[in-house]
A protein has these predicted regions:
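Cytoplasmic juxtamembrane regions at transmembrane-helix boundaries
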Residues: 129-141
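Hydrophobic alpha-helical transmembrane segments of small proteolipidic membrane proteins, enriched
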Residues: 1-40, 46-132
Length: 141
């Protein structure tokens, strides 16, 4: 079972890294789009809103779910630690604490991914509201 620890860590941290890179890429693309878009040229507010909010749900989903992914890594790490202790029959405090500390880093990583994603989502949603206000002002709304 000890051989599963690197696989669990790689999977959890790999998923979190992938999600964070995807979120940053989407945020950069959206910021570039918001700078270039002219809301006054849209005939429909619904079409503008659809274009402005495209892929923002990915960032909010990453923000809300990355702590759970980290928590899953922590739970699996704790399970592996206790399984190893049960299999060896040794109650060495050092190995218990080391195993638990390593398991908790997954939760920390999930939170580290979530916090910037929440901030990015808030900034991008604010830009959407600004562009929609531009549309409303241009179309007498």
């Amino acid at each position: 079972m000890q051989g599963l620890r690197p696989i669990v860590e790689f999977a959890v941290f790999g998923v979190l890294m992938l999600l964070s890179v995807a979120s940053v890429a989407i945020a950069l693309e959206r910021l570039r789009f918001y700078r270039q878009v002219d809301a006054r040229l849209y005939a429909s507010r619904a079409r503008l809103e659809s274009d402005l909010t495209r892929r923002l749900n990915v960032i909010s989903t990453v923000a809300s779910n990355s702590p759970y992914i980290g928590l899953l890594g922590t739970v699996l790490g704790i399970m592996l630690t206790f399984q190893t202790l049960g299999a060896t029959g040794e109650m060495d405090v050092k190995s218990i604490m080391t195993g638990l500390a390593l398991a908790l880093k997954a939760t920390a990583a999930g939170i580290v991914v979530a916090i910037p994603c929440v901030a990015l989502n808030n900034v991008l949603r604010r830009r959407v509201r600004e562009r929609l206000t531009d549309f409303d002002e241009a179309h007498g709304g």
